[in-house]
Amino acid sequence: MIVVSMTSWTKRITYVKKVVESIMNNTVQPDRVYLNLSETEFQGIQLPQDLVDYFNSDERLIINWVSGPTTKAMKKIFPILKYLQDDDIIIDADDDILFPKDLIESRLNDFERNGKRYSISSNTHTSVGFNGQMKVVSAMSLFQKKMFNHWQEFVTQAIVDTNNDDRTYLHLIWLNGFLNRGCTKWNIFILLEQYDMKLDNPISKKNSDFKGGLIYDRIAQKEFNRISNKNVIDSFGFWK
């Protein structure tokens, strides 16, 4: 089974329908898409009706309400593990990015090419956000459920307080005896044409209070200059 798992919060929930539509329009469709939402965060807040209607129209789309003291963090993947088998594939997705039509197919090809022995970690890609701006994100990595075994023993409150979710996933993969490989990059200009969007000013996905925020901003600016001035058609990544 191929599962896409994602989360969102109140300031981005209006984007989610478009994100999921871009996922479901892929050349390879997932068997399930889980949207994990915190009961605490959304208490007293009505979800957008178009999002509710869209999820109700397809049994593969599931809103998974999550409760507990740590629901504001680490809820992109962990809440769905109890529904999966060891060899099931999990692809995580950000909630404010439009994805290429062949993204899931590309991740699966990377997984096959590496002998199904590695997680496929996203390169930091140049992607298209909803305001037409370029964003530097690390979106849609591929895992298997067994790569997260013993997560409840590892993800203590101290881990939640001191680590972000992506770093925690990587550490769990290592602890379970797996390694990761970088994914194939996609062509930013094909993505722009697919969604009829223009390249505008680059911004960083990271908040300014994140310790890596400034370097992400510099990377976004550098990549924007590289693409717009030199018309280079490949997208940027930290590793291959």
What are these regions (language model features)?
Residues 31-32, 89:
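Residues at the starts of beta-strands that form the adenosine-phosphate
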Residues 3-11, 26:
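A conserved hydrophobic helix/loop-capping motif in glycosyltransferases and polysaccharide synthases
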Residues 36-88:
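Active-site-proximal specificity loops/subdomain of glycosyltransferases
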Residues 1, 14-19, 152-240:
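C-terminal catalytic/acceptor-binding lobe
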Residues 135-154:
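Conserved nucleotide-sugar donor-binding
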Residues 101-125:
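Conserved donor-nucleotide/metal-binding helix-loop-beta segment in metal-dependent transferases, i.e.
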